[in-house]
């Protein structure tokens, strides 16, 4: 099964998990780059990113077109912003909704607090599916590296391999 991980990462947590998963399951990766610049520090980060997420913005991407035809499974990864999917991933999902519905899908969310469950539910709704084949929630995985985090990533990978 050929797998692609499509993800957005602002501070590196989602990038860290995506690369760990890619190594474990032998997946290709595609990091989404937004043309909109998001603040990465302080209160402005939460204000601008949260507002953008709540308003369900779909910023233009610099990442170029992503061809999903050769992939059987797509894993979507994102940071949680105000209990929502980060806007750049929302853009990708809306642009590829029909293609994604025909794939085996998994998703993971990285968060500093809470809201990942709601964000994953909203992502399923945006795609138009009932469930992901695998779901993972990771709390600041890059900053809080531990055996528990490693075990959670490994468990997610095992679920993906079972798809």
Task: Indicate where each model-derived feature is located.
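Short, glycine-/small-residue-rich phosphate/pyrophosphate-handling segment
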Residues: 106-141
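Conserved donor sugar-nucleotide recognition element shared by glycan-biosynthetic enzymes
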Residues: 85, 116-120, 149
């Amino acid at each position: 099964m050929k797998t692609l991980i499509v993800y957005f990462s602002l501070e590196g947590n989602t990038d860290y998990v995506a690369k760990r998963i890619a190594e474990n399951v032998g997946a290709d990766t595609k990091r989404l780059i937004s043309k909109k610049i998001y603040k990465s520090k302080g209160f402005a980060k939460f204000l601008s990113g949260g507002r953008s997420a709540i308003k369900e913005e779909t910023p233009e991407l610099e990442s170029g077109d992503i061809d999903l035809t050769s992939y059987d499974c797509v894993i979507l990864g994102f940071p949680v912003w105000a209990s929502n999917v980060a806007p750049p991933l929302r853009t990708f999902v809306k642009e590829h909704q029909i293609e994604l519905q025909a794939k085996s899908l998994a998703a993971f969310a990285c968060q500093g607090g809470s809201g990942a469950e709601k964000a994953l539910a909203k992502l399923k709704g945006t795609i138009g599916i009932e469930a992901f084949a695998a779901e993972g929630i990771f709390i600041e995985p890059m900053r809080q590296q531990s055996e528990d985090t490693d075990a959670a990533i490994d468990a997610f990978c095992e679920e993906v391999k079972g798809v």
